[in-house]
Amino acid sequence: MISKKVVLPLVFSAPFIFFFVLCIVVVMTISRENQVGDDFIGGGDGEYETVGIAPEVERFRAVFEKYARQEGVFDQVNIIMALTMQESGGRSLDIMQSSESIGLPPNSITDPERSIEVGIKHFKKVFKQAGGDVRLTLQAYNFGSGFIDYVKKNGGKYTKKLALDFSRLQAFKMGWKSYGDPSYVDHVMRYVKGSDKNVKPVKGSMDFYETVMKEALKYEGQPYAWGGSNPETGFDCSGLVQWSFAKAGITLPRTAQEQHGATKKISEKEATAGDLVFFGGTYEGKAITHVGIYVGNGRMFNSNDSGIQYSDLKSGYWRDHLVSFGRIK
C-alpha cells in the first residue's frame, strides 16, 4: 500500500510531466521545421554532369560528397567540383582556395580535406544568400557576397553585364586595375554540361509536353517563391506546374495535394515525360508536399528551395521522399 506521503507528490507531478513532454514535442517540431527551412536545400543541379575534372580533384569526390551532404547541398557536388577546377585544378593543398573565407591569408590551409570542408561551408552560405541561383552563387564566391546585394538592387537576377559592371565599380573604388574575375561563371561552367534551354522531343512523351516545358524553362534558375503562382510573384512547386500546364490549355488545381488528387496514379515504369511526380514529408504539412514535372530518364523539372531547375529522382533526397507518379486525366 502506497502511503499518502508518496501518492501526493506523484499526483502533483503529473502536470509537470505533461508540460515537460509537451515542451520536448514542441522543440522537436521546431527543430524539424528549421532543418527543412534552413539546413536542407533540396533539389539542386542534378542536370549538371562534370566534364574534364582533373584526377587531382576527382580523387576527392568522396570528400566533396561527405561535406556537401553534411551542409545540405549534396545536389550541388558537381558544381562545387567544377568550381574547384577553376580555383586550383587540384594543384594546391588549399584545393578550394577557401582560406580567405575564414579570414586567413591565401593558401594558409594546407590540408585538402580541411579546404573542402571550409569551402563547402562558404559555398552553402553564399548559395542561401543567392536564393539558390547557381550562377549568382558562383560569381559571389569569386567577388564576395557584396555582389549579391548589388544584383538585388539591379534587377535581382545574375547577368554577365552585372558582373562586368560590379568588377569595374569595385576596381575604381579600390584604385586597382581590375577586381575579381567577371567571367568566373563561364570559366566554372566549362567543367559541367547542363540542360538545353531548347526543349527536344522525348519519345513517348505526352502531346503537350513540349509546350509545357517551353514555358517552364523560361523560369529556370529563378528562386523558389512560397505561394507564388505567376511570373510576377515567382513560383512555388505547384504554382509552376499549374502555370506551365495552363499554357498547353490544361487546367490544374492550385496545390500539390490537389494536383495529386486530379491525376490518375501510375507506376514509375509507366511514367513518361509530361506526367507529374509527387512527394511527401518535404516539410510539415499535408500528405503530398511537393510536385514536379517528370521529364524522363529519372529526372524532373521543379521549383524547390534551391530554385527552379532539374532534379534527379534516382537517389538521394527526392528518391527518399517520392510518393507516386500521376497522369493528367
Swiss-Prot record:
Temperature dependence: Optimum temperature is 32 degrees Celsius.
Major location category of this protein: secreted
Record-linked InterPro entries: CwlT-like_lysozyme, Lysozyme-like_dom_sf, NLP_P60_dom, Papain-like_cys_pep_sf, Peptidase_C40
EC nos: 3.2.1.17, 3.4.-.-
Summary of pH dependence: Optimum pH is 6.5.
Subcellular location as annotated: Secreted
Region entry Muramidase, spans: 59-192
Catalytic activity: Hydrolysis of (1->4)-beta-linkages between N-acetylmuramic acid and N-acetyl-D-glucosamine residues in a peptidoglycan and between N-acetyl-D-glucosamine residues in chitodextrins
EC top class, as a word: hydrolase
Pfam families, A to Z: Lysozyme_like, NLPC_P60
First and last residue of the signal peptide: 1-29
Domain NlpC/P60 as annotated: residue spans: 206-329
Active-site feature positions: 237, 290, 302
GO terms assigned for molecular function: cysteine-type peptidase activity; endopeptidase activity; lysozyme activity
Disruption phenotype: Deletion mutant shows no detectable conjugative transfer of ICEBs1.
Phenotype when changing residue 94 to N: Loss of muramidase activity
Keyword annotations: Cell wall biogenesis/degradation, Conjugation, Hydrolase, Protease, Secreted, Signal, Thiol protease
The family this protein is said to belong to: Belongs to the peptidase C40 family.
Misc remark: The cwlT gene is located in the region of the mobile genetic element ICEBs1, an integrative and conjugative element (ICE) found in B.subtilis. Exogenous CwlT causes lysis of B.subtilis and B.anthracis, most likely by causing at least minimal degradation of the cell wall.
Protein name: Bifunctional muramidase/DL-endopeptidase CwlT
Lineage: Bacteria, Bacillati, Bacillota, Bacilli, Bacillales
Gene of this entry: cwlT
